[in-house]
Amino acid sequence: DTASEIGTNIIVVVNDNEMSIAENHGGLYKNLKLLRESNGQAELNFFKAMGFDYMYVEEGNDVSKLVEAFKKVKDIDHPIVVHIHSEKGHGYKPAVDNKENWHWSMPFNIEDGSLKNLSGGENISLMLGDWLLDEMKRDEKLVAIAAGVPRCYGYDKEKREQAGKQFIDVGIAEEEAVALASGMAKRGAHPVFSDFATFFQRTYDQLCQDLAVNGNPAVFNVLGASIYGMNDFTHICFFDIPMISHIPNLHYLAPTSYEELIAMEKWAINQDKYSIAIRVPEGPVVHSCEEYDTDYSDLNKFKMAHRGEKIAIIAVGNFFYKGEAVRLALANDGIDATLINPRYLSGVDEVMLERSEEHTSELQSRL
């Protein structure tokens, strides 16, 4: 609202297509709905309350109407909001019919909207979402939190309805999601907030101040965190380790497989001592028959998958199997390398590393 006090001809354009990514949540959207229904004439006007002049444009997909509106305001001598009512996906029937799915898309066939080059493989985020949905039936304190992208859990409208009050979408407000999770954990709930790694940058203050300072036992699933994840200019998913792992009292775990992920989830959700972030494996889903620990409260204790000599390979998360491939390649050359699954990104197992130094002359780290 500072802009309303500047006194210049700042023009704020609000593109109101009645959607967030999924459905909207929050009081602001109720006022937008009231303004749409009254053709911008409702006395209750959020923007005017902040000191802005206001203009409403109903036909937001009509270029001529938009040009007409902008001509009227381009030389105005005070701040104004131009509230434009548009349709998300306008002009392409598949996108209009399923607005949430078409917020973004992989390459598709323009004729019918079907996706090209479908891999048909498993999706670990969807699998995690289904597991959480099943857990909700056993744990009434468990609440899944999303920040405008419920489909990161695979939660379409039907699954959101199944979860009921055990699912909360705060809208595109990641800071609120972390603060909410922290407060819920403080009062004994089992909140789990899942989002893509690139969006956790928005939560840094809340992770440090609302969560970690208080040590509240909330759980945060960091999705797409890898060079395999989103990596364009505005959605970069591989800076999560330096950002999250150094925050005191926030413990960052890195499972290597789906089964290890679920083992860590079960522990993290049911313990009440630590703030936990989990780096969900990215790329093709890996399954393992290994028996994983059920208690991870012995913090920063690495796991030695294979003891060898001369070389130690530390392979983190979904790079563990690359480390295993390197170990096998070295074995073919007669070198028996040690392979370590660190499991924790926020600390170092000094005892294991010191023991490894006794048996190795080289330490190779793979992240």
Where are the regions a protein language model picked out?
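Mobile "lid/hinge" segments at catalytic clefts and subdomain interfaces of large enzymes
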Residues: 4-31, 35-37, 44-46, 214, ...
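Acidic, Ser/Thr-rich peripheral helices and adjacent loops at domain boundaries
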Residues: 27-41, 101-107, 241-242
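Thiamine diphosphate
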Residues: 52-69, 75-276, 284
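Long hydrophobic segments that form regular secondary structure
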Residues: 56, 62-77, 273, 307-341
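Generic long, charged, amphipathic alpha-helical segments
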Residues: 160, 166-170, 305, 317, ...
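Aromatic-enriched
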Residues: 284-303
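Single conserved hydrophobic/aromatic residue that forms the stacking wall/gate
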Residues: 358-367
